[in-house]
C-alpha cells in the first residue's frame, strides 16, 4: 500500500533539508527510532510543511526562531541550512536570531548565533 502523505513528506523534507541531511537521518534509523522518523516525515513534512498559508522561506525562518527559543542547537543547524535552501538570506537569519534575543534571552541567542555561524561560514567563536 502506498502512503502518498509520507512520499510527499519525504520529497518536501529532501527539498528543504537537502538529500544528504535526510540520508543521514535515515541511515541511523533503528527499529526503535523508525516510528518517530515516519511520524516526522508523514506529519510535519507531509502535512504542516505542505500547507498554503506560509511560503517555505517563512516556515523555515519561523522554525529557526522556535528552535532558538527551545535551545535545540542540533536541529537549529539543520534548519538554518534549510532556510538558506529556501531562499532566506544570511541577513534574514541574523535578524531572526537577534529578534529572538529579546524574547528568548541572551544565553539562548548566543548559542543560536554560534550554531548558525557554523552553517553560514562565519564560524569564529564569539
Question: Which residues fall in each region the model found?
Answer:
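Mid-chain, well-packed structural core segment of small domains
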Residues: 61-64, 68-94
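Residues at alpha-helix boundaries and the short loops/turns that link adjacent helices
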Residues: 16-19, 73, 87, 103
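Short amphipathic alpha-helical segments at helix boundaries and their inter-helical linkers
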Residues: 36, 73-79, 100-115
